[in-house]
Amino acid sequence: RPPRAQGHEVAAISPLSGGCVARVACADLRGGERVVVKWAVAPGARLDVEAFMLRLLGTHLGDLVPRVLHDEDDLLIMSHIPNDGVRSDAGMGALGEALGRLHGVGSSAFGLDRDTLIGPLRLPNAWGDAWTDFYGERRLRAMAREAHEAGRLEASDRRRVDRLCERLG
């Protein structure tokens, strides 16, 4: 669905790389604004969940995160962040500083009020009191279970993940 469906007329569009559940393109709108558009191509893609995550990151990182302009289950329109597309020491340093700011965000518990996604995989985020329990159960074991059920992780490796999680706790 093109951005015109949301009241915008596209002057030019060019594909961007990336995305495992959606196609991504840069769109120049007739009014002069440049936006990034993602539209779902994988079954069950939830671009509205990505929009939630971008908004949450934006509360901590401001203009380093694209601003969500419109979202639906299968469509996401966000601001374009100008860049030259070249990896640099300065860019990697800025990334490190941003990650440091995120790691400085405190809370009395670990989790979120809703589950999120990483690509096509659901990330459970039920609240927990201990980081080791949260990480072991909701990241390591959850991903190992998904990978095993998809036939991408042997049962012996899943048991190894389980043993690691037991040692974490």
Where are these regions (language model features)?
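ATP-binding pocket architecture of kinase catalytic cores
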Residues: 14-133
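A generic local structural motif
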Residues: 11, 65, 166-167
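An alpha-helical support segment within catalytic cores of ATP-dependent transferases
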Residues: 1-3, 82, 107-169
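Conserved N-terminal boundary motif of the eukaryotic protein kinase catalytic domain
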Residues: 7-15
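A broad structural signal for alpha-helix termini and local helix breaks/kinks
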Residues: 3-7, 61
